[in-house]
A protein has these predicted regions:
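Extracellular lectin-like interaction modules
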Residues: 1-238
């Protein structure tokens, strides 16, 4: 599944060139809900099941009984613009029902960034080496488009050890500047997965084979090292 957004939302901000600076966060954490999986019915609890299914791994807590699940909910800011520049002291949750055209999205040091769009996520910066996304752990989702392009990858400048999760219906082109690219799970469903890193490309999972780290119709990697002798990357083609 590429699209984890099950509601269509009107944009919060519409413009040509949108710039937002926040002395806090952009988007918000909106509480949590706890469920017993054994008590959920596909006939009467569709919203709850969709909430669990669409949650990122780090938004889920599963109790030792294997039945109790807590979902931490997050609300993004939806923006429709030709160019988006965001800077926040804390985390950033950005969404959109059209293409998300990123100049710069910069969160606080080590803070999480989520960019989830109904279409594609693209680099619209005018400088070739401009860092588009700056922060900590990163989630990218392009439900019906690509992330970056062959001519203009999305440039990442993330904190040491920050993990990247990316899902795209088509292609993914990512360039990690100034360090390693830590791949939690990168899926280019119907296209090319192309990754460039100034440092190494390493798995973001604790155990090799725990999840598929890289998946696409074809995979291209340019990095100093690929994988680690203690934690191999898990790869799937097709």
């Amino acid at each position: 599944m590429v699209d984890t957004q099950y509601m269509i939302e009107d944009p919060n901000v519409v413009g040509k060139n949108v710039t937002i600076e926040a002395n806090g966060s952009i988007g918000q954490d909106t509480g949590s809900e706890t469920f017993k999986l054994s008590e959920l019915s596909p006939e009467t609890d569709v919203d709850k099941i969709l909430l669990i299914a669409s949650a990122e791994r780090d938004n889920l807590e599963i109790a030792e009984d294997g039945d109790t699940v807590t979902v931490h909910k997050r609300e993004d800011v939806d923006i429709h613009a030709d160019s988006i520049t965001l800077k926040a002291r804390d985390y950033i949750y950005l969404g959109g029902e059209e293409d998300i055209n990123v100049n710069t999205v910069e969160a606080g040091e080590g803070q999480k960034i989520t960019i989830a769009g109904a279409k594609g996520i693209y680099n619209v910066a005018t400088e070739a080496d401009h860092a588009n996304v700056i922060g900590g752990d990163l989630v990218l989702e392009a439900a019906d488009g690509s992330i970056g392009t062959e001519d203009k990858a999305l440039n990442l400048k993330l904190a040491d050890g920050a993990k990247v999760t990316a899902r795209s219906q088509n292609d993914i082109f990512l360039n990690s500047t100034g360090g390693d690219l830590v791949a939690e799970s990168l899926l280019a469903k119907d296209g090319v997965l192309s990754l460039t890193a100034d440092g190494s490309l390493i798995a973001g999972t604790l155990k090799e084979g725990e999840i598929v780290n890289l998946q696409g119709q074809s995979i291209v990697v340019n990095a100093e090292n690929v994988g680690d002798e203690d934690n191999y990357l898990t790869v799937a083609l097709g």
